[in-house]
């Protein structure tokens, strides 16, 4: 944990020093029938609009921001906001054939409800389509561990994932994504959530995305 935090603290300096290599900029926007995050709705079961921008270097360093409309009704501080805005930076690279590493730091912010803000340091591996990731919550925030698998299937790709949110919940996700009309994509996902207190939720979401 300390080694992971030490590395991500040094990431800004590493990114600046790597700017001499080629830099690319990308963006994305999406409309979803329900914004599901770790099995939990972030839009009160309704639609949400999201989008973001990323800057990456040939050497593997990246920095980006992502935002989404949100809607909460649980009586907590986040109920007072209708926006989530995340900022992240990291490093991604292939460490062997069909094996890749991604490590970074992300800040989740909710303008107007700063008590809900939290940070995570994360690390993930993709090994022949199997993924495993660990997000360490900072300053008392809960940790999250997930495993999954993705494979090309027909005109798109199939994915399945399971996650454990420390002292909070377990979630399961299965989905299919495919490209339509060049830069447009469609995704259909089934999610299932089990809270630590025994409550739960499940459903199907539809997402339309554009990433030029």
Where do the protein language model's features map onto the residues?
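Outer-membrane beta-barrel proteins
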Residues: 2-10, 16-212
